[in-house]
């Protein structure tokens, strides 16, 4: 199933909502207060292709295999699963990655639809956001109107992997909302609603984050406290429409490459620090850095099918080539899906381009573009390997002594050996052209290294 199919099952026909009266609910007298609901209404959604409720876990079932995550994340909204036993007055230091997601211009729905339909549409969007966050091992914490707060990370997950999960969740949210859900709603409602999404992300270490049980008596909530957590809502507010704002905690901890970010520009000037730029106890501004995630560039790194991440339309033969990365673990070749997790240093990698012969696939010109980023890479930042294949024979053109071409199971496999050396995010891109420089295929794999 594709993202398009899942969205069609869950969002087509949202405009067709009828009402029927439900049984009146009896009121209950509380201390000093009388509560009575009277006549409630049950929404009966008449969908052309889906049942009355979103098919829970369908986005998860589509997304998780691409990130090599087993099973489903069935955690309910609320307390982080490791902290359910935290009593009132207790605190606990635990790192976390905090996410705030806000759906922009959703208030306009109230001007276009009856409120009953507005409820259904907004609820469906939030349900999808919850499932996408859970697909990347996030823990939805709280709903606030048309916004969602979530946490990533736990004691048995590395900090690096939690950050990668959060960034991947932000990029996947943007992809599915902007390219699938919002267009489906526009078509169904018959209006260009101009919905958008803004996301804030930041990481806080153990000494920066305290979890506590806040509240009184039965009115309690276990949540996180600390500057990185508190600032994430402000990051979301500063994010441009349809992108995510990354906080200093993420930028610094994994040495996230500037090439995959953009500056925040306000009134023609770059905004380098989160605003308001609060001061510390010495009265000095904290100057907490911010950068926008470059969604267009990072989206290309997601391990989804080319059609799903909107790359197939620019290439001629998306289905006659396949680009993969393998890591050697315990003397075995293990598939590593792009940006799916952080790898240790000193691991051998093999990039493989499979070429499936077919009509139109003749002689080829192939370039592998390696790009390292970050402080550890320093001068070792980029290298290109160029080869051509003529009459099914490999011709090495540039820096290609280590490349090899094998015939296997009816296809040709071109291999490029590499190694994990530098901390951060690094990429290998392949570009395949035919005669007259026609673009046959292009794909890119991101490798996170601890």
Swiss-Prot record:
Changing residue 144 to A: Loss of phage T5 resistance, wild-type cCMP production. It holds the Pfam family AGS_C. The keyword DNA-binding does not apply. Its EC number is 4.6.1.6. One of its GO terms (biological process) is intracellular signal transduction. Belongs to the adenylyl cyclase class-4/guanylyl cyclase family. Pyrimidine cyclase subfamily. It comes from Escherichia coli. Mn(2+) 2 binds at residues 102-103, 146. SUPFAM superfamilies: Nucleotide cyclase. Residues 318-450 are annotated as: AGS-C domain. Optimum pH is 7.5-9.0. A ribonucleoside 5'-triphosphate binds at residue 100. Keywords: Antiviral defense, Cytoplasm, Lyase, Manganese, Metal-binding, Nucleotide-binding. Transmembrane segments: none annotated. Pycsar (pyrimidine cyclase system for antiphage resistance) provides immunity against bacteriophage. The pyrimidine cyclase (PycC) synthesizes cyclic nucleotides in response to infection; these serve as specific second messenger signals. The signal activates the adjacent effector, leading to bacterial cell death and abortive phage infection. A clade E Pycsar system. The pyrimidine cyclase gene of a two-gene Pycsar system, generates cyclic CMP (cCMP) from CTP in response to bacteriophage infection. Has little to no activity on ATP, GTP or UTP. Expression of this and adjacent effector EcPycTM (AC P0DV25) confers resistance to bacteriophage P1 and T5; expression of this gene alone does not confer resistance. When cells expressing the Pycsar system are infected by phage T5 at low multiplicity of infection (0.2 MOI) the culture survives, at 2.0 MOI bacteria enter growth arrest. It catalyses: CTP = 3',5'-cyclic CMP + diphosphate. GO terms for molecular function: adenylate cyclase activity; metal ion binding; nucleotide binding. Mn(2+) 1 binds at residues 102, 146. This is Cytidylate cyclase. T5 phage that escape Pycsar have mutated major capsid protein pb8 (D20, AC Q6QGD8); infection with these phage elicits less cCMP production. Ectopic expression of the capsid protein in addition to both Pycsar genes does not induce effector-mediated toxicity, suggesting another factor is necessary. Homodimer.
């Amino acid at each position: 199933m594709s993202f398009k199919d899942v969205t069609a099952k869950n969002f087509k026909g949202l405009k067709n909502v009828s009402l029927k009266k439900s049984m009146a609910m009896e009121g209950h007298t509380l201390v000093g207060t009388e509560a009575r609901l009277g006549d409630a209404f049950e929404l009966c959604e008449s969908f052309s292709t889906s049942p009355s409720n979103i098919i829970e876990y369908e986005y998860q079932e589509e997304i998780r295999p691409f990130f090599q995550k087993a099973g489903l994340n069935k955690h309910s909204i609320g307390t982080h699963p490791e902290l359910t036993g935290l009593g009132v007055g207790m605190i606990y230091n635990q790192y976390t990655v905090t996410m705030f997601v806000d759906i922009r211009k959703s208030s306009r729905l109230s001007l276009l639809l009856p409120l009953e339909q507005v409820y259904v549409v907004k609820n469906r969007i939030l349900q999808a956001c919850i499932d996408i966050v859970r697909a990347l091992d996030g823990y939805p914490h709280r709903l606030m109107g048309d916004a969602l707060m979530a946490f990533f990370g736990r004691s048995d997950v590395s900090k690096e992997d939690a950050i990668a999960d959060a960034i991947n969740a932000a990029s996947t949210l943007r992809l599915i909302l902007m390219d699938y859900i919002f267009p489906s709603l526009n078509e169904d409602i018959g209006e260009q609603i101009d919905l958008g999404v803004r996301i804030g992300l930041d990481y806080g270490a153990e000494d920066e984050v305290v979890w506590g049980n806040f509240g009184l008596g039965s009115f309690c909530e276990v949540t996180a406290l600390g500057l990185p957590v508190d600032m994430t809502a402000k990051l979301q507010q500063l994010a441009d429409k349809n992108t995510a704002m990354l906080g200093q905690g993420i930028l610094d901890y994994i040495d996230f490459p500037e090439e995959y970010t953009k500056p925040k520009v306000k009134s023609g000037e770059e905004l380098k620090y989160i605003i308001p730029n609060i001061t510390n106890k010495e009265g000095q501004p904290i100057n907490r850095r911010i950068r926008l995630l470059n969604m267009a560039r990072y989206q290309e790194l997601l391990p989804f099918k080319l059609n799903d991440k909107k790359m197939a339309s620019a290439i001629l033969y998306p289905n006659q080539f396949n680009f993969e990365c393998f890591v050697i673990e315990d003397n075995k070749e293990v598939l590593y899906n792009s940006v799916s997790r952080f790898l240790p240093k000193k691991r051998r990698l093999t990039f493989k381009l499979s070429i499936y012969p077919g009509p139109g696939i003749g002689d080829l010109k192939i370039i592998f573009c390696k790009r390292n980023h970050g402080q550890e890479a320093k001068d070792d930042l980029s290298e290109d390997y160029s080869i051509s294949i003529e009459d099914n024979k490999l011709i090495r053109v540039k820096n290609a002594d280590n490349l090899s071409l094998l015939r296997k199971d009816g296809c040709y496999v071109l291999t490029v050996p590499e190694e994990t050396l530098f901390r951060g995010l690094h990429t290998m891109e392949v570009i395949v052209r035919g005669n007259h420089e026609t673009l046959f295929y292009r794909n890119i794999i991101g490798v996170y290294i601890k």
